[in-house]
Amino acid sequence: MATAASNHYSLLTSSASIVHAEPPGGMQQGAGGYREAQSLVQGDYGALQSNGHPLSHAHQWITALSHGGGGGGGGGGGGGGGGGGGGGDGSPWSTSPLGQPDIKPSVVVQQGGRGDELHGPGALQQQHQQQQQQQQQQQQQQQQQQQQQQQRPPHLVHHAANHHPGPGAWRSAAAAAHLPPSMGASNGGLLYSQPSFTVNGMLGAGGQPAGLHHHGLRDAHDEPHHADHHPHPHSHPHQQPPPPPPPQGPPGHPGAHHDPHSDEDTPTSDDLEQFAKQFKQRRIKLGFTQADVGLALGTLYGNVFSQTTICRFEALQLSFKNMCKLKPLLNKWLEEADSSSGSPTSIDKIAAQGRKRKKRTSIEVSVKGALESHFLKCPKPSAQEITSLADSLQLEKEVVRVWFCNRRQKEKRMTPPGGTLPGAEDVYGGSRDTPPHHGVQTPVQ
């Protein structure tokens, strides 16, 4: 009896070592390591923890053998009980466990698990076939997922791709990370016997609850049905599409890049110079003096400007800031004067009201050049010459006469003091035209 008990105890330890020490894929050729070593250790640890002592697998083996062999009735009681049960004549086991390598138990029931875990040769082959079918289904689902991703917008495809790792990573990492400890201990076979990852965040049959899967799978599950919505702002704020750019008008449109009045507000120095020249020519052609323009600006627009200010504007002698402020007002005045040329307007009335002396005559540049050339020939023309010259230049006779008078006074101012210019007597016709204060004064006796 002692020998039989010791043999049975050795049978227990050796059979347990055969079951648990055999490497994956050693029971069946071509299995290709259908389980990972980490999964086996975790499953065995779950079985040990659920049954409460380290010989739980061995006890389950004895239970199966006692029913299958028909030898001893009390074989499943423990170490000593196993020895007592093995004393029958009909025991199918020999003293050496290696004597009958073909006899293996078919079913081992995990008492702490949800269902039965198969460890027989046929069961292992069946599990291998199931896993191959699951892998094929996963490949088909991945192909469908890729087709769906090709139909999505680019930002949704990128969003979904960041949260879909490979099936192997989810089988080993996601299930171990998201299952609670009690669930992992009681359901040891669940970690590797059932898949924990499918496309679009759906779990396999009998898998973990839907609330335990990764938040990235929830986002990916929602995206196919709501592809037209933006990604979740809390999970992926950087995936939101950028705001659309502001609309731009045609290239030549002033409102496309800047304010429509920016050219008038900040003109360049070249623009100011060209406008001042154009303004002076238009003012002279319309027959308005600088004082008339300043008075008209004060009456029409509320800004009174003197004749000196208008003169300095035309001569570009104001500061750049003041030139920029005065330019739009003068431009408006020019537009109104051009539109009302040829008929008496409010500008003419305003100029007449403010005019206390004879209107200052403005002479164009071309007319002034003709008068200047005639002055060089004859500084003091006769009345007949003045009349003919006024008719040829379409000017009044009084205007021509006053111009020659003013020109002679200008020539005298240009004469250096204490002497006369060379040929001055020839120009002015002797000393009879010389003013009295230019004569030789005798000292007082």
UniProtKB/Swiss-Prot annotation:
Biased segments, Low complexity type: 125-151, 163-173
Gly residues biased stretches: 67-90
Any one Gene Ontology cellular component term annotated for this protein: transcription regulator complex
Family annotation (Gene3D superfamilies): Homeodomain-like, lambda repressor-like DNA-binding domains
The name this protein goes by in its record: POU domain, class 3, transcription factor 2
Skewed-composition ranges (Basic residues): 227-237
Domain POU-specific: 264-338
Entry's localization field: Nucleus
DNA-binding region: 356-415
SMART domains referenced in this protein's UniProt entry, alphabetically: HOX, POU
Similarity remark: Belongs to the POU transcription factor family. Class-3 subfamily.
Biased composition annotated in UniProt, kind: Pro residues: 239-253
GO molecular function: DNA binding; DNA-binding transcription activator activity, RNA polymerase II-specific; DNA-binding transcription factor activity; identical protein binding; RNA polymerase II cis-regulatory region sequence-specific DNA binding; sequence-specific DNA binding
Region (Disordered): 64-173, 203-269, 411-445
Presence of the UniProt keyword Lipoprotein in the record: no
Subunit structure: Interacts with PQBP1. Interaction with ISL1.
Organism ancestry: Eukaryota, Metazoa, Chordata, Craniata, Vertebrata
Keywords: Activator, Differentiation, DNA-binding, Homeobox, Neurogenesis, Nucleus, Phosphoprotein, Transcription, Transcription regulation
Role this protein plays: Transcription factor that plays a key role in neuronal differentiation. Binds preferentially to the recognition sequence which consists of two distinct half-sites, ('GCAT') and ('TAAT'), separated by a non-conserved spacer region of 0, 2, or 3 nucleotides. Acts as a transcriptional activator when binding cooperatively with SOX4, SOX11, or SOX12 to gene promoters. The combination of three transcription factors, ASCL1, POU3F2/BRN2 and MYT1L, is sufficient to reprogram fibroblasts and other somatic cells into induced neuronal (iN) cells in vitro.
Entries under InterPro entries matching the protein: HD (IPR001356), Homeobox_CS (IPR017970), Homeodomain-like_sf (IPR009057), Lambda_DNA-bd_dom_sf (IPR010982), POU (IPR013847), POU_dom (IPR000327), POU_domain_TF (IPR050255), TF_POU_3 (IPR016362)
UniProt source species: Mus musculus
Tissue specificity annotation: Expressed specifically in the neuroectodermal cell lineage.
Compositional bias ranges of the Basic and acidic residues kind: 217-226
GO biological process, one term: neuron fate specification
Modified sites of kind Phosphoserine: 343
